[in-house]
Amino acid sequence: MADEQQFIEDGLQRTQIDEFFAEELGRAGYGGMDVAKTPMGTQIVLKAEKPGMVIGKGGKNIRKITTELEDRFNLDDPQVDVQEVDEPDLNARIVADRLANALERGWYFRKAGHTTIDRIMESGALGAEIVLSGKVTGARSRVEKFNRGYVKHNGEPAEEIVDSGVGVAVMKLGTIGVRVKIIPPNAELPDDFEIYEDVDVEDYVADTDGESVEELLEGEPEDSETAEELDEDVAAGADDDSEADEEFVDEEIVEEDVEVPTDDDVEDVDVDELEEAVDEELDEDVEAEAEELMDEMDEEGDDE
């Protein structure tokens, strides 16, 4: 059988056993059960307001219940342990059954609801809620709620902290569902906090291997030493950065291939020869201009 199917079968069997106990032990104040399967058999812990009625005279009733569990639910060697409920008014299952019985006996629903929730709060509960749904007073179905204190309705606290119980009152006009939620007195809610006034902080300081605060402070370095170490670290980091920059520049110079002319490649040029060449070019230009002027003057003389 697959794990999912086995999980469903175990939950269904647990619900059927719970309904069986509720029918058989209703007058004894049945308050719930815990089932645990062990190698030695199935361990069942019953919670009841009147354990004597569950056990019976000479254990007759408990033997009958054990035989019924083996036959109806195929449990291997069931071992039933009965525990008495310390405070019945804080058990949601017992309170729901009591309220349902009161409604069946003819109590007015509002009186029964207020009386029940007042008893719950007087027992020390942090909060309680009672919901009656069905044909409470007339032919039409409706819902009536009674609240006291603080009750969580969702999240993990609603599943782990809040105690829930359900009962059914069979009336002439129809059934009335009874749902009860109770937060016990010792519940630790996630939003609880305490404020201490005029408290010495040293009383709440945790000891570290028996060492005092002064001994712990002696082992710590002074501020001046710490500052010097920081300066040394900064200087070392700056040197490392400069070396890294130099290496990077050298790599760039090596990568770039630049041709630089050397002294051997440059030809030796005589300055005097350059000056003579310039003078010769100037003399030739001057002579050419002089000849042009003489020709123009001769042409003007001939015209006259």
Curated annotation (Swiss-Prot):
Gene Ontology MF, one: rRNA binding
GO BP field: translation
Keyword Transferase annotated: no
Domain of life of the organism encoding this protein: Archaea
UniProt cross-references to SUPFAM superfamilies, sorted A to Z: Prokaryotic type KH domain (KH-domain type II), Ribosomal protein S3 C-terminal domain
UniProt keyword Heme present: no
Subunit structure and binding partners: Part of the 30S ribosomal subunit.
Name of the protein described by the UniProt record: Small ribosomal subunit protein uS3
Protein species of origin: Haloarcula marismortui (strain ATCC 43049 / DSM 3752 / JCM 8966 / VKM B-1809)
Upper lineage: Archaea, Methanobacteriati, Methanobacteriota, Stenosarchaea group, Halobacteria
